[in-house]
Every structure is written in structure tokens, then in C-alpha cells.
């Protein structure tokens, strides 16, 4: 009976598992770690003869990845809630707006030189140069000294020979008697060796005077003097012309690889990837039986973030579960936090009508409805059997401006958001019966808000599909433009009191994401007519993780739509003439929320039917999938107030339904007769919190590494409802960026020093309370900036994570008007995973963000490709081995992307000078803590300093005589830093890691901007 507590029925089988989505875009890179300490220089070896320059040595191997950080303590899990009813597959999220790429971080200073690598093997000697042309002949030697004269007289003794030449034989003795004639001088000897002139022979003693006889015959000619020694070598000819350039010697063997370089600092986080394209809706499964509603679990204490798990492979979609028996109506569970609003899915074709549901218990009386215009009396229409859920249709073009929608329920207070424009006050919705409490939603990280998609055509209401397996939660779609105020809908029949859903286990607290770049405001879409409140469908399985989209522009605050009672939708029939108001009929079971059907011509307003008698309590039906908003019917007369039911416990927040497609504004129906004013109904249960507002765009990320200059404050996002303040986050370790070091003196290209090991990745601190702006910190040395890494694969979409690092404090946002309490619908199960869309283009670079408080060191980013070697420089003169040159300048920092999930902390590196705490930024929107995303792929380690390029071989010199090897020369000055290589190519994304631990449920964020009103839903049963 109305107000009674029903016994929960058996739990139905879960629906089929959703198909795995395509892999998401790569996740963001990690933060840049501090520079490693410089290694000690190796001892220099003796200087050998310089060979031709060998090829440049290879860069040292990258250092090992840092050790994983300590996993956070796991918070105590909350009580496990019962499994929610399976719902139809959720519609895939729309493509998120591509965020702006952060500005390139300032070029880091060169890190200290690492230890000198082992000297490379000396290159082979080059082939000797060709011999130069023969030198000119030397000058002819001067003639040698004349040989000694022959001895005078017969007995003249031969003159002493010059030192080189032998002494000529003595002339024959003369006949005694007259003095012989002087012998002729011997022929000129060959040129002597510049030896001393031979001593002139002493004249022989005169012979005894003979009798004067006849003159003797002249003495024989003396023998020619011996050939003088060779003259001194002629003067060296002028140097020959240089010989033709000899062929280059064979390339010397590559130098031995230097010592393993320290890991480079992690690259700057990559830009947030674009939201993946909207996936096709999965097939509609068979509706599973409703499970028993469990009691709502209390929220467990927030646990520390657990270690990031490796992502598991997506499971296969299970077959549809058999339809279970409907469970008995349960007591409404306590109100849970509102889930995120999903993106509108495409409208599916009209499904065939389903079986008529059993009559449900009389629901709690609804609040007094708005008085509608009197309708012309008509015959009582019969309730048609519910039709099967149609497949999700594709979003159609934006509809015409619709009427202003009713205000949604007020969400839990979120953190203080940036000042935004005040939202429009929503109209009070018709309270519905409390729905069954669904399981607690998973914590997901706040996804980037995508641009509003065009409103699709209204689909027909389809049957409820089987609940898919929990998939990855897609990114939240962008807030749509504010819709026009909708006409008050007819008061629905109170639905059955749903059984309380089980309380979900408390997820762990996810790592806080960085505040994304503030996107430009999205264009205001046409104002669609306010749709009639649709039935809350079960939340589909989470879709496969889409690539993290860039932060979309904050949309205008939309009016939350009503949450209609879930009833099995019947086929859309022609609207009959309103009959006389009958007795209130028994409330039907919550139907599946069908997709929005095509907008039909407005029918005449029906007269209120006779109130039917309360039927027997039917079993609680399964939570229907949330369909697109149906056409908004003409306002009906207010129904009589029902009996006050027992106050239901606060239910868990319902899953955020997908925003309905904007429906075309229907024609105004003829005014119906004014119905009697019913007595005021009891105060309805507090509705589930409205959909979370779009997350305000964060300011652009600062430069990688130590905190850079203060960035622009992003435009304030829409003001959300004030939420409970989050716990202050710990101060991180990030220091200020140091100035660039001076370039060392030029030397021969030094070996590539291995970079120091990366510092441990600090834990990401939760946003702390707004603190005063600190003085600028002492700049620390800039580490080598890695190439922009590929965006890592996105992790599972968890619930909204903690706010990112606080940005600059913004003005307090204006409190938007609180919406009236809407109907409290049961939260649906998680929808099926949406297909990940292709990553969007990188956004333009944002200005550097303000220095945030240092966060915990992030995990190393993915290793980037090695940079190309620089051009070869001219050969240097062979000098003594120089000291290791300083590490080349770091490459430009890549665009800073979203912060990936914190990976394991690497080994602690030398802590840089800690900069003062930056100005405390405004508290980010407190998102629901998402499940721990997949661990981002390893960030780029940064390039090792490139070895200075080898110069081209010089022209071979003239071959001179080999001199004795001289002693090793003194050690030369350190070589100049090599020119930085080009940024390497982005590495391929790494494999998706297993899914991380479940994150905690975060507090509800502020009410987001109103989404585009959906098209009017089909008229309800009379």
C-alpha cells in the first residue's frame, strides 16, 4: 500500500558487459624531475696521436626508471552497496573541446655536466695522404777541393789525400839530375765533401845534383786525385704542392658507449588530448530483472590515493542477462550524490512496444503541480504497453530554441569555484516518487568539457536494454547553452517506491589532476523547448576511456532537467482528448526512460482523467535507462495531493543522466479548462543533486620543471553550489626554475655525460586552503627538458577527482539560484563504455600558469626519441683530452599536457632549491574522485646532451718525418657544449596499464551550466 515498506526482491542478473572501447589517446606526460647530480669526471688518459675524427659517439643509455612512489594508504572502504539495477547503455560522450596547449616552458638551464663517459675507442688512422710531388732537385754541390798536386820531382811524395778522397799515388821517381818539371795538376776531382783541403804534400828533397845531363823526360802525369766525397746535401727543395686530398680514412669504430646516463627529467606533461569521438551506442540488451535494493552505504572516510594499477584489458561484452523477476518494492535509500551528467547520445529508432508492466504500488503523492491551462475534455486514454527501448540515435542538428527548463535539484555543495555568471533560476519541478537507491558511482576524474554538440532529433522511446558491464566512464560533455524555460509538465503518477540501492564501496581518492587550460566559452546554442521529465534510466556501463579532451569552454549554466518517475514507456500514441478527471490510478512501475521521440504536432490538452483506485503494490521494476527527454506535454491540471508517504531515506545521488537532445519547441496547445486545485501535497524528498556543472577551465599549465612564472588566471567558471571544502593538500616539493648556466669554455667535444637520475616523483598534493602568495623562489637549475611525449592512453574515467593544483585565487563565484527540488529518481547503473574518439589537435599554447605550490614529484614521463645529431663541426686541433664539456642546452619543453596519474616515485634525485610557495590559486571545483586512471605511459626522459658533432676531416697535411712521440700534453679545457639536437619524434604510446584502484567518491561539484533542453517527451499514459 502507499507508504508501506516493501520487501526487496531477489537481485536480477547483471546486464551484458559493454564492448571494449578503442584505446584512448595517450595520457599526459609526467612532470619534469629535478636534474641529476653531476657525475665525477673520469680520469683523462694519455694523449695519443690524433687520428681522423671518428663518428660521434652514441648517447649513453637512458638511466633506469625511477622507483615507484609509495602508494598512498588505502582509505577504509565504505560499506558495499547492493548492485544497482542494470540500465541501458549510456550514450557516448560528445567530443570534448580541444584544450589549448600550454606555452613552451622556458628553456631550462643546462644541467651540470655528468661524469665523463669512458673514452671512445680511437678511430682508425686515416689513410695516408698522397705523397706530394717530388721536390725540386737540390742545387749542385760546390766542386770539391782540388786534389793534392803531384809531388814535384821524381821523388815528390804524394800529397796527403783529403779526408774523404784517397791519396793519389806518388809519381814515379824522377831521374836524378835535373829537377823534374812540375807535374801537371791532376784532373779536378769530383766535388769533395766539403772536407778540409788536403795538406799539400811536402816537396821531396832535392835530388843530388846530377851531372848536368840532358833534361830528363817530363815526369808522368800524376794520377788524378781520388773522387772527393759527396758534397753536402743540397738545400731542400721548396715544399711540393700539397698532394691531392687522400681518401678519408675508414670510419673509426664507434666510441665505447659512455656510462649509462642518468634518467633525464620527465618531460613536461603533454597537452590534454582531445575527447574521443562519440562512440556508437552498443546494442540494446535484454532488460535484466531488478535486483533487490540494498541499503545505502555510508560514505567511507576518504582514503589516501592508492598506487596506480596497470590497466587491464577491456573485458568482452557479456551476453544479455535473462530477465529476472521483478523485485519487491524497497524502501527508498538515502539520497546519494548526483552523478555526472552524461553527454547526449544519438536518438535511436522507435522500438517495438514492450510488455505491459504490472501495476505498481501507489507512489508517494507528488507535490502540487502547476496549474495548467484547461484542456478540452476527452475520453480516457488507455495506457499502452511499454515499447522496447530503441537504439541510441545520433545527435541531430540543434533544435529551435525551446522553452526554459525547470530548475534541477540542488547538488551537494562543491568547492568554492571561480566567480561565474549567476545562473538562471529554474522552475520548480514536479517531485516524483523516490527511486531506488543505486550503487555508489565510481570516482572519476573530471574530464575536459567538450564543446556542446548539436541537439539530435528526438528519438522514440525504446525499451530498456540490458545493463552493460561497467565500462570506462566517458568525459563529461560540455554544458549546453541555456534552454528556454519549459512549460510546466503534467503531474505524473507517483511511481513505486523503489527499493533502496546498495551502498557502494567507497573508492579511493584519486590523484588530483592539474587544472586545465581555460577554454573559450562555447557558443550558446538555440534555446530548446523544455522537455517533459523523462524517466530515469539505469546508468549504462562506463564507456571505454576516451582520450582526455582538452578543457572545453565553460558553457552557460543550464537548467537541470526534471527527473521523471521511471515508468515503462508505452508506445507513443496519439494524444486523445482529455477526459474528465478520474480517480488517481495506481502508480505504474518505473518505466525505462526512452529516447526522445520525434516531435509531433501538439495535441489538444487532455482533461484530467478520473482518479483510479490504488492498485495492488507491484514489484519494483528495474531502474530504467535514462532516456532522452520526451516532448513536453501541455500542462495538465494539478492532481490531488496523495497521502504523505513515509519519508524515504536519503538515496545515493543518482547517476548523472545524459543531457537530452534539444527538442524543437512545440506549438502551444489550446488552453484546457482549469482543473481543481488540489490540496498541497507533502513535501517531496530532496531530489538528487543536479548534474555537476562543467568544470571551470583551469589556467594554462605552467612550464615544466620547477614552477615558472605566474600564469594567467583563467576566466571564472560558472558558480557552483558551495561544496564542502576539501582538505588542504600538502605542499609539494617543486622548486623554482633556476637560471640557465653559462656555457663552458670550448674544448673538443666531450663525451655525452649521462644525465643524473631523475628525482623521486612527489605525490600530488591535494589543493590546500588558499594561501598567501609567496615570494619568488630561488631559481634552481633547469633540468634537461624532454621532448614532448605522446599523450598517454587515458585511464578509466573515474568520478571527479580532486581539484588540481590550486591556481591563482579568483574572486568568489556568485551563488547561483538554487533550483527547486526535483523528483528524486533512482540512480541508474553505470552506462556502457563510450568509444574513445580520436585525439584532437593540440590547442594553442597557453601562457605559463602561476607558480603552484610544489606538488609531489610526478612519475617519469615517457621516454622520447633521441634527438638527431647536430651537424659535424670543423675538426679541432689535436689537443690533450679535454675535461668533459658541459651538457648541451636542454631541448625545448614540450607542451604541458594534463597531469597523468601519479606514477611510482623515482629514486630521489638531488633536491633543487625550493622555491617559495606560489600564490594559492582558487579552489578548483571539487570533482568526484574518479577511479585511479591508467598509469600514464612513461614520460620522456629528456635527451641526453648530444655529443658535440665531429668536425669534417681536415685536409691531410704533408707527410713529414715521424718524430718521436712527445709526452702527453696537459689536459685541455672542457669542450664547448654541443648544439642541442632537434626534438625527437614522439614515442609511440605505451600499452594501457591495468586499471588502477577505485578512487573515492568526491563531493558533488557546483551545479553546471544548463544543458540544452531536450525535446518534449511523449505524452504519458492518461
From Swiss-Prot:
Q: Which UniProt keywords apply?
A: Calcium, Collagen, Extinct organism protein, Extracellular matrix, Glycoprotein, Hydroxylation, Phosphoprotein, Repeat, Secreted
PTM per UniProt? Answer: Prolines at the third position of the tripeptide repeating unit (G-X-Y) are hydroxylated in some or all of the chains.
Q: Where is the composition biased (Pro residues)?
A: 163-175, 670-682, 826-836, 872-887, 1007-1022
Q: Which residues carry this modification: 5-hydroxylysine?
A: 95, 260, 335, 581, 692, 863, 926, 938
Question: Where is the PTM Phosphoserine found along the chain?
Answer: 101, 617
Q: Where is this region: Disordered?
A: 1-1022
**GO CC aspect terms:** collagen trimer; extracellular matrix; extracellular space
Primary location recorded for the protein, binned into one broad class: secreted
Q: Where is the composition biased (Gly residues)?
A: 315-324
Q: Where is the composition biased (Low complexity)?
A: 28-47, 109-125, 143-161, 209-259, 368-394, 403-422, 464-491, 530-557, 614-628, 641-668, 697-713, 742-751, 761-776, 838-853, 908-922, 956-989
Report residues carrying sugar chains. Answer: 95, 938
Q: What does this protein do?
A: Type I collagen is a member of group I collagen (fibrillar forming collagen).
What further note is attached to this protein's record? These protein fragments were extracted from ancient bone material. The displayed protein fragments were extracted from an ancient caudal vertebra bone collected in Ultima Esperanza, Chile and around 13045 years old. The tryptic peptides required multiple purification steps in order to eliminate contaminants and to increase the concentration of peptidic material.
Its assembly, as annotated, is:
Trimers of one alpha 2(I) and two alpha 1(I) chains.
Q: What is this protein called?
A: Collagen alpha-1(I) chain
- Organism of origin is Mylodon darwinii
Amino acid at each position: 500500500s502507499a507508504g508501506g515498506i516493501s520487501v526487496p526482491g531477489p537481485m536480477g542478473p547483471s546486464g551484458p558487459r559493454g564492448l571494449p572501447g578503442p584505446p584512448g589517446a595517450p595520457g599526459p606526460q609526467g612532470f619534469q624531475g629535478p636534474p641529476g647530480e653531476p657525475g665525477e669526471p673520469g680520469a683523462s688518459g694519455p694523449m695519443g696521436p690524433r687520428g681522423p675524427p671518428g663518428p660521434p659517439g652514441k648517447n649513453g643509455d637512458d638511466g633506469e626508471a625511477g622507483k615507484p612512489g609509495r602508494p598512498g594508504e588505502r582509505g577504509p572502504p565504505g560499506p558495499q552497496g547492493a548492485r544497482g539495477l542494470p540500465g541501458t547503455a549510456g550514450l557516448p560522450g560528445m567530443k570534448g573541446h580541444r584544450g589549448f596547449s600550454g606555452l613552451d616552458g622556458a628553456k631550462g638551464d643546462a644541467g651540470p655536466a655528468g661524469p665523463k663517459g669512458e673514452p671512445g675507442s680511437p678511430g682508425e688512422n686515416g689513410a695516408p695522404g698522397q705523397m706530394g710531388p717530388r721536390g725540386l732537385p737540390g742545387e749542385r754541390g760546390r766542386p770539391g777541393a782540388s786534389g793534392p798536386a803531384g809531388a814535384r820531382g821524381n821523388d815528390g811524395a804524394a800529397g796527403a789525400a783529403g779526408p774523404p778522397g784517397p791519396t793519389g799515388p806518388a809519381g814515379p821517381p824522377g831521374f836524378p839530375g835535373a829537377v823534374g818539371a812540375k807535374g801537371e795538376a791532376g784532373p779536378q776531382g769530383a766535388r769533395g765533401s766539403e772536407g778540409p783541403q788536403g795538406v799539400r804534400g811536402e816537396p821531396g828533397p832535392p835530388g843530388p845534383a846530377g851531372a848536368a845531363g840532358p833534361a830528363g823526360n817530363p815526369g808522368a802525369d800524376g794520377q788524378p786525385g781520388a773522387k772527393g766525397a759527396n758534397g753536402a746535401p743540397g738545400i731542400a727543395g721548396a715544399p711540393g704542392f700539397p698532394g691531392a686530398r687522400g681518401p678519408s680514412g675508414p670510419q673509426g669504430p664507434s666510441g665505447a658507449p659512455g656510462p649509462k646516463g642518468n634518467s633525464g627529467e620527465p618531460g613536461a606533461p603533454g597537452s590534454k588530448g582531445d575527447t574521443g569521438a562519440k562512440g556508437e551506442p552498443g546494442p540494446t540488451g535484454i532488460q535484466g530483472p531488478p535486483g533487490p535494493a540494498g541499503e545505502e552505504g555510508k560514505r567511507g572516510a576518504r582514503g589516501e590515493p592508492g598506487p596506480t594499477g596497470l590497466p587491464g584489458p577491456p573485458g568482452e561484452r557479456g551476453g544479455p542477462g535473462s530477465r529476472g523477476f521483478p523485485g519487491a518494492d524497497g524502501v527508498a535509500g538515502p539520497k546519494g550524490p548526483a552523478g555526472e551528467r552524461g553527454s547526449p547520445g544519438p536518438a535511436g529508432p522507435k522500438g517495438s512496444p514492450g510488455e505491459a508492466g504490472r501495476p505498481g504500488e501507489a507512489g508517494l503523492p507528488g507535490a502540487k503541480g502547476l496549474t495548467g491551462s484547461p484542456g478540452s475534455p476527452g475520453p480516457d486514454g488507455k495506457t499502452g504497453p511499454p515499447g522496447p527501448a530503441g537504439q541510441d540515435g545520433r545527435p541531430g542538428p540543434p533544435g529551435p530554441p525551446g522553452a526554459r527548463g525547470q530548475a534541477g535539484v540542488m547538488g551537494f555543495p562543491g568547492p568554492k569555484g571561480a566567480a561565474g555568471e549567476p545562473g538562471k533560476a529554474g522552475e520548480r519541478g514536479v517531485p516524483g516518487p523516490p527511486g531506488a537507491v543505486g550503487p555508489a558511482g565510481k570516482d572519476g576524474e573530471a574530464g575536459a568539457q567538450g564543446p556542446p554538440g548539436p541537439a539530435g532529433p528526438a528519438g522514440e522511446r525504446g525499451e530498456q536494454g540490458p545493463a552493460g558491464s561497467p565500462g570506462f566512464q566517458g568525459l563529461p560533455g560540455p554544458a549546453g547553452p541555456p534552454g528556454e524555460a519549459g512549460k510546466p509538465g503534467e503531474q505524473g503518477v507517483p511511481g513505486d517506491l523503489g527499493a533502496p540501492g546498495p551502498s557502494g564501496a567507497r573508492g579511493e581518492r584519486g590523484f588530483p589532476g592539474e587544472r586545465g587550460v581555460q577554454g573559450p566559452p562555447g557558443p550558446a546554442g538555440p534555446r530548446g523547448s523544455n522537455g517533459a521529465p523523462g524517466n530515469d534510466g539505469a546508468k549504462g556501463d562506463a564507456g571505454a576511456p576516451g582520450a582526455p579532451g582538452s578543457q572545453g569552454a565553460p558553457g552557460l549554466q543550464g537548467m537541470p532537467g526534471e527527473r521523471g518517475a521511471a515508468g515503462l514507456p508505452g508506445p507513443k500514441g496519439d494524444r486523445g482528448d482529455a477526459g474528465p478527471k478520474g480517480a488517481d490510478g495506481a502508480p505504474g512501475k518505473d518505466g525505462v526512460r526512452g529516447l526522445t521521440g520525434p516531435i509531433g504536432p501538439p495535441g489538444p490538452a487532455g482533461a484530467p482523467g478520473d482518479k483510479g483506485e490504488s492498485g495492488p503494490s507491484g514489484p519494483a521494476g528495474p531502474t530504467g535507462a535514462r532516456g532522452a527527454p520526451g516532448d513536453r506535454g501541455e500542462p495538465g491540471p494539478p492532481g490531488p495531493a496523495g497521502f504523505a508517504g513515509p519519508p524515504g531515506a536519503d538515496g545515493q545521488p543518482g547517476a548523472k543522466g545524459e543531457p537530452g537532445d534539444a527538442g524543437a519547441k512545440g506549438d502551444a496547445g489550446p488552453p484546457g479548462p482549469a482543473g481543481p486545485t488540489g490540496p498541497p501535497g507533502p513535501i517531496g524528498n530532496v531530489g538528487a543533486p543536479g548534474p555537476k556543472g562543467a568544470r571551470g577551465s583551469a589556467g594554462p599549465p605552467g612550464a615544466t620543471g620547477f614552477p615558472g612564472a605566474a600564469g594567467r588566471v583563467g576566466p571564472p567558471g560558472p558558480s557552483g553550489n558551495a561544496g564542502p571544502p576539501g582538505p588542504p593538500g600538502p605542499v609539494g616539493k617543486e622548486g623554482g626554475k633556476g637560471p640557465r648556466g653559462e656555457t663552458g669554455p670550448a674544448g673538443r667535444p666531450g663525451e655525452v655525460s649521462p644525465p643524473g637520475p631523475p628525482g623521486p616523483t612527489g605525490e600530488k598534493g591535494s589543493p590546500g586552503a588558499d594561501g598567501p602568495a609567496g615570494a619568488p623562489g630561488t631559481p634552481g637549475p633547469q633540468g634537461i627538458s624532454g621532448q614532448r611525449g605522446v599523450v598517454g592512453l587515458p585511464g578509466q574515467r573515474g568520478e571527479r577527482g580532486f581539484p588540481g593544483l590550486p591556481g591563482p585565487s579568483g574572486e568568489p563565484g556568485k551563488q547561483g539560484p538554487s533550483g527547486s527540488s526535483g523528483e528524486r529518481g533512482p540512480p541508474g547503473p553505470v552506462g556502457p563504455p563510450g568509444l574513445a574518439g580520436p585525439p584532437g589537435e593540440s590547442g594553442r599554447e597557453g601562457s605559463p600558469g602561476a607558480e603552484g605550490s610544489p606538488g609531489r614529484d610526478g612519475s617519469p614521463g615517457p621516454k622520447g626519441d633521441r634527438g638527431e645529431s647536430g651537424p659535424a663541426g670543423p675538426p679541432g686541433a689535436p689537443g690533450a683530452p679535454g675535461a668533459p664539456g658541459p651538457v648541451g642546452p636542454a631541448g625545448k619543453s614540450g607542451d604541458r599536457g594534463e597531469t597523468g596519474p601519479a606514477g611510482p616515485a623515482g629514486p630521489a634525485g638531488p633536491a633543487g632549491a625550493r622555491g617559495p610557495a606560489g600564490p594559492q590559486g582558487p579552489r578548483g571545483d571539487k570533482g568526484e574522485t574518479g577511479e585511479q586512471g591508467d598509469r600514464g605511459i612513461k614520460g620522456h626522459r629528456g635527451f641526453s646532451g648530444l655529443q658535440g658533432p665531429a668536425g669534417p676531416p681536415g685536409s691531410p697535411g704533408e707527410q713529414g718525418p715521424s718524430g718521436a712521440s712527445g709526452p702527453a700534453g696537459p689536459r685541455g679545457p672542457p669542450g664547448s657544449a654541443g648544439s642541442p639536437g632537434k626534438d625527437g619524434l614522439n614515442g609511440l604510446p605505451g600499452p594501457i596499464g591495468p586499471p588502477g584502484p577505485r578512487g573515492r567518491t568526491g563531493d558533488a561539484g557546483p551545479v553546471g551550466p544548463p544543458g540544452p533542453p531536450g525535446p518534449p517527451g511523449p505524452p504519458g499514459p492518461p
